């Protein structure tokens, strides 16, 4: 089991309250299966994995925001493409 020093993670994020929000957001991403862990899982819980990623500087609130925006844009593009294909098929 990996030892996580929360103080190191707090220093990366700025304060402990934002750390809780970022770690929870990242843990949900990993738990839902939509995202792979960026550090070796080593049989750790998703919350520990999220904290380790933050501690190593791999995840920040800004990084999560950018990734989510990219995913939304990709999803919208796919939806537009699907609608266009359906519309062209009806002609």
From Swiss-Prot:
PANTHER family: DNA-DIRECTED RNA POLYMERASE SUBUNIT OMEGA (PTHR34476:SF1). It catalyses: RNA(n) + a ribonucleoside 5'-triphosphate = RNA(n+1) + diphosphate. The keyword Zinc does not apply. The keyword Nucleotidyltransferase applies. Pfam families: RNA_pol_Rpb6. One of its GO terms (cellular component) is cytosolic DNA-directed RNA polymerase complex. The RNAP catalytic core consists of 2 alpha, 1 beta, 1 beta' and 1 omega subunit. When a sigma factor is associated with the core the holoenzyme is formed, which can initiate transcription. InterPro entries: DNA-dir_RNA_pol_omega (IPR003716), Pol_omega/Rpo6/RPB6 (IPR006110), RPB6/omega-like_sf (IPR036161). This is DNA-directed RNA polymerase subunit omega. Promotes RNA polymerase assembly. Latches the N- and C-terminal regions of the beta' subunit thereby facilitating its interaction with the beta and alpha subunits. Its EC number is 2.7.7.6. Belongs to the RNA polymerase subunit omega family. The gene is rpoZ.
